[in-house]
């Protein structure tokens, strides 16, 4: 079977795979016209944003739809700015847009790769802020009804790296636009690592933005130079009792208390202290500066990356008794699959 359309430039790992058909859409009407017939005929279909959260392990036996819709509109009332953003907008460029227009609240989320439409799917987050903190609503194309529907932030069922779009609406919805609500009374979020040195009464949104960009640029490789998907593993969440037990064995373990009493561990710390920082397996490796990032060292296949990920998961479990979970979607011949080799 021939797969004539290369996906190499459409995934940030730079994996060389192809697909049967590749279509770009720039409006909601185009999206409906393309996606609904494919869905109704049960043909394999993948809706792709920036390709920064995906690992292709095989050629894709179906149609890849790239969402390139653009547009940002802003309204306001006494307390909030309200933004409506089309799904194809670049996330980091949106962060820059808000700061340049004197709207704060997204600065902690600077330099997260990908598009706005992908952001709600895994409830993106960094440095103490998650999308759910500033999301107002999400609009999506319901593939069963063919209608454009809107969910409130509560209806999105957000949790850590999860949403209704990874649950009940998986493969049944295509996000078309996102609504954000940014408070005019700004409260800096400074609880995480490199932001703790700022003073809450003097720090500005631009200060936080620049620090986040600086830290991410130092630790995260440029995917144009070294293929990667950013953080490959979720930070595991364990019970307080399990954390106390681990802390007795590993006094320097990094953990963050959660509102429900659980503790979120730093997956990068676990990987590094399992001896895997800089580890290489075939053409894939654990990044030497940030152990949470897996990289394509040249000509890695999706299988190479999955093999390395499984090795990391097994090693961390052997050392700490903690099971890591991959963040990116794993795409096989006919659609999404599990992490395997």
From Swiss-Prot:
Cofactor(s) the record lists: FAD
Top-level lineage group: Bacteria
GO biological process terms on file: cell division; cell wall organization; peptidoglycan biosynthetic process; regulation of cell shape
Protein name: UDP-N-acetylenolpyruvoylglucosamine reductase
InterPro entries, sorted: FAD-bd_PCMH, FAD-bd_PCMH-like_sf, FAD-bd_PCMH_sub1, FAD-bd_PCMH_sub2, MurB, MurB_C, MurB_C_sf, Oxid_FAD_bind_N
Keywords annotated in UniProt: Cell cycle, Cell division, Cell shape, Cell wall biogenesis/degradation, Cytoplasm, FAD, Flavoprotein, NADP, Oxidoreductase, Peptidoglycan synthesis
Recorded GO CC terms: cytosol
Pathway field: Cell wall biogenesis; peptidoglycan biosynthesis
EC number(s) reported in the record: 1.3.1.98
Main location: cytoplasm
Family per similarity comment: Belongs to the MurB family.
HAMAP family cross-referenced by the UniProt entry: MurB
Residues of the active site: 161, 231, 327
Function summary: Cell wall formation.
Catalytic activity: UDP-N-acetyl-alpha-D-muramate + NADP(+) = UDP-N-acetyl-3-O-(1-carboxyvinyl)-alpha-D-glucosamine + NADPH + H(+)
Subcellular locations according to the entry: Cytoplasm
A Gene Ontology molecular function term of the record: flavin adenine dinucleotide binding
Domain FAD-binding PCMH-type: 15-185
Keyword NAD assigned: no
